[in-house]
Amino acid sequence: MKRRSVCVGDTVYVLAGNDKGKQGKVLRCLKDKVVVEGINVRVKNIKRSQENPKGKRINIEAPLHISNVRLSIDNQPARLFVKVTEKGRELWNKHSDGSSSLYRLVRERKG
């Protein structure tokens, strides 16, 4: 499975769907989906019960596929790639105008 460049708390840019072009903060990461705050909001109807005698409608954020979001750096969608250094460190780097800059450490390789 491909490594995810998006983590909880990151700001992402939506590439496809009804909320295309919007930005939001990642609340949860699932296997190949992410839940973004205020994006892809669905209405859930709650049945009548003793706690809710009239029933209720609540808004929940539905998950988006990971391919439909891109990490937002400086309010622009950014493409990231993994670079392995001589010491075995895996780093997320981003391309910008021909140069690359470090964004986040992925992991340290042993050995």
UniProtKB/Swiss-Prot annotation:
Assembly and oligomerization: Part of the 50S ribosomal subunit.
Database matches in InterPro entries: KOW, Rib_uL2_dom2, Ribosomal_uL24, Ribosomal_uL24_CS, Ribosomal_uL24_KOW, Translation_prot_SH3-like_sf
Gene name tied to this protein: rplX
GO biological process: translation
CDD domains recorded: KOW_RPL26
Protein name: Large ribosomal subunit protein uL24
Statement: the UniProt record of this protein carries the keyword Cell membrane: no
Any single Gene Ontology cellular-component annotation: ribosome
PROSITE patterns in alphabetical order: RIBOSOMAL_L24 (PS01108)
Lineage, opening ranks: Bacteria, Pseudomonadati, Chlamydiota, Chlamydiia, Chlamydiales
Stored NCBIfam families: rplX_bact
Job description of the protein: One of two assembly initiator proteins, it binds directly to the 5'-end of the 23S rRNA, where it nucleates assembly of the 50S subunit.
GO terms assigned for molecular function: rRNA binding; structural constituent of ribosome
Signal peptide coordinates: none
Membrane-spanning ranges: none
Keyword terms, alphabetized: Ribonucleoprotein, Ribosomal protein, RNA-binding, rRNA-binding
Entry similarity comment: Belongs to the universal ribosomal protein uL24 family.
